[in-house]
């Protein structure tokens, strides 16, 4: 790289990262870059995120102020019951293993993405919103070439992406799903972005686009004009926790991912990890037990209590190690989520995670926007489908995270991957801080995930690793033959001890990095 680095963006696609870099070079800050990047991701990673979904932005400003923008999806204000709406299963083929998801118009929750991006821009942005949309508009109109990960996600989600003619126009314009090396175009989405830049979020929530949405949904959804008009972004104080003399900032309740990461780190802080060589059976056993205890704590203390005002103090304040393990819930093999991390030269840090679920299969007519299926996500509905409280923010495992050293951003990261989000972030934090691996190696190092008495391990150099592990709870181990997106996609940026900036995109999900230069 020639010239001085003035910022770095890590994301799930090279063009997503490039969009953020362009904003930094235009004089924007980390928050401008994050917004431009996620708008670009709605084009080049559209099977993972969408203006029809939601997410979270964790912001640490150069003035040492921190904010968590919660723009995740909201349940409708009236629950008509599952039988009253268009809500049905669809089976997806994960290369020999089939899994069922629930989609349809009745699976759609109120999307928060548009409101959230405008709220963050109003509070923290520097560049005009019309500038932030420019990369996404260019990608949508001029087209972009599908990469290997686009090919995988499009192929996997084909039954959902092609449910309607609107989806087939974009994802299968010649009758077959677009594949790697082919070019995709989304000109209607470019028009939507320009309308949003001109009219603001009211056009989406109270205006012409709202009419299009509700007319297309008809009686098949629980959503009403009031649901859309009443949507509010929640600006929360991030959850703060200590780990090895550093401050951890992450997503607070009512989302579960951040508090579970803080809980796991609290458990690990009791151990001198230098006595547990990275990759050894002892280290894998320890981390597996920590993950198991975190899952147990979620079931016993969090599920059903995430909207209680004192849940942080109660959950992180006591010793839960003696609790009994129960049976864990469903595992989402994909985790249709993407993440963006940004550092700028002024000391601002942005960590933004967003998702559309698997998508509902329903597109807003004439826009190229597929709406979410959050009401059909089993891990977001632990009490069962259509048991949700009306008018309430859904919980999430998304956990944008920032680690501070003397109130300065040291590490900014997040991940996709549903229930593996927290285990992926936990391991990268420990690889980088405890084991002092360079960020690229910390992200690239093999990972594990424990869930439902099943331990999944990426390939390791330790011979017969499964034979060396001992579990008394019936846990069964599976050693994968190669690294896989199942284990998350951690995209992170950091400041080095020399004061320079570095970034890493997780190769498991075709991650990429872009640096802005003077």
From Swiss-Prot:
Which intervals of the chain form a coiled coil?
A: none
Its PTM note reads: Cleaved by autocatalysis into a large and a small subunit.
The source's domain of life comes to Bacteria
Give the E.C. number(s).
3.4.19.13, 2.3.2.2
Subunit field text: This enzyme consists of two polypeptide chains, which are synthesized in precursor form from a single polypeptide.
- Classification via NCBIfam families: g_glut_trans
Q: Where is the active site?
A: 337
A biological process term (GO) from this entry: proteolysis
MF terms (GO), sorted A to Z: glutathione hydrolase activity; leukotriene C4 gamma-glutamyl transferase activity
Q: Which InterPro entries match?
A: GGT_bact, GGT_lsub_C, GGT_peptidase, GGT_ssub, Ntn_hydrolases_N
Pfam families, sorted: G_glu_transpept
- Name the keywords, alphabetized: Acyltransferase, Glutathione biosynthesis, Hydrolase, Protease, Signal, Transferase, Zymogen
Protein's UniProt name:
Glutathione hydrolase proenzyme
Q: Which reaction equation describes what this protein catalyses?
A: an N-terminal (5-L-glutamyl)-[peptide] + an alpha-amino acid = 5-L-glutamyl amino acid + an N-terminal L-alpha-aminoacyl-[peptide]; glutathione + H2O = L-cysteinylglycine + L-glutamate; an S-substituted glutathione + H2O = an S-substituted L-cysteinylglycine + L-glutamate
Give a yes or no for keyword Protease in this entry.
yes
Q: Which pathway does the database say it acts in?
A: Sulfur metabolism; glutathione metabolism
Q: Which organism is it from?
A: Synechocystis sp. (strain ATCC 27184 / PCC 6803 / Kazusa)
Q: Which family does it belong to?
A: Belongs to the gamma-glutamyltransferase family.
């Amino acid at each position: 790289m020639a010239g001085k680095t003035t910022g770095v963006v890590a994301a799930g696609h090279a063009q997503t990262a490039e969009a953020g870099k362009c904003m930094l070079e235009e004089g924007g800050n980390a928050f401008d870059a994050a917004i431009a990047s996620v708008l670009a991701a709605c084009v080049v990673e559209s099977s993972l995120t969408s203006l029809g979904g939601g997410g979270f932005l964790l912001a640490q400003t150069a003035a040492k102020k921190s904010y968590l923008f919660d723009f995740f999806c909201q349940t409708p204000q009236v629950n008509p019951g599952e039988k009253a709406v268009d809500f049905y299963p669809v089976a997806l083929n994960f290369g020999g293993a089939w899994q069922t998801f629930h989609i349809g118009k009745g699976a759609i929750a109120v999307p928060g993405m548009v409101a959230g991006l405008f709220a963050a821009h109003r509070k923290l942005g520097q560049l005009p919103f019309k500038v932030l949309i420019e990369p996404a508009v260019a990608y949508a109109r001029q087209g972009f070439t599908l990469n290997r990960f686009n090919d995988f996600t499009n192929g996997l989600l084909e039954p959902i992406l092609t449910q309607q003619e609107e989806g087939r126009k974009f994802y299968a314009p010649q009758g077959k799903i677009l594949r790697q090396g082919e070019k995709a175009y989304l000109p209607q989405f470019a028009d939507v972005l320009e309308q949003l830049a001109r009219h603001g979020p009211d056009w989406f929530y109270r205006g012409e686009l709202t009419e299009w949405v509700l007319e297309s949904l008809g009686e098949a959804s629980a959503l009403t004009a009031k649901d859309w008009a009443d949507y509010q972004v929640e600006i929360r104080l991030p959850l703060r926790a200590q780990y090895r003399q550093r401050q951890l900032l992450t997503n607070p309740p009512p989302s579960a991912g951040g508090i579970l990461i803080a809980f796991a780190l609290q458990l690990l802080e009791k151990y001198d990890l230098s006595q547990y060589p990275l990759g050894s059976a002892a280290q894998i056993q320890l981390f597996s037990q920590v993950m198991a205890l975190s899952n147990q704590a979620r079931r016993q203390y969090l599920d059903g209590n995430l909207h209680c005002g004192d849940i942080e103090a109660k959950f992180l304040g006591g010793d839960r190690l003696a609790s009994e393990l129960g049976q864990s819930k469903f595992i989402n093999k994909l985790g249709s989520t993407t993440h963006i991390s940004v550092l700028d030269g002024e000391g601002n840090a942005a960590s933004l995670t967003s998702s559309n679920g698997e998508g509902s299969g329903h597109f807003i007519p004439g826009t190229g926007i597929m709406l979410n299926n959050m009401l059909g996500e089993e891990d977001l509905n632990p009490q069962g489908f259509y048991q949700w409280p009306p008018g309430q923010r859904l919980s999430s495992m998304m956990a944008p995270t920032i680690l501070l050293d003397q109130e300065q951003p040291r590490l900014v990261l997040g991940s996709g991957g549903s229930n593996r989000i927290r285990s992926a972030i936990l391991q990268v934090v420990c690889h980088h801080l405890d084991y002092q691996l360079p960020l690229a190696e910390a992200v690239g190092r093999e990972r594990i995930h424990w869930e439902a008495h099943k331990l999944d391990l990426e390939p390791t150099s330790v011979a017969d690793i499964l034979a060396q592990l001992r579990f008394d709870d019936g846990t069964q181990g599976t050693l994968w033959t190669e690294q896989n997106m199942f284990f998350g996609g951690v995209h992170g940026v950091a400041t080095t001890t020399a004061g320079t900036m570095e970034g890493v995109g997780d190769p498991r999900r075709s991650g990429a990095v872009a640096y802005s230069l003077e």
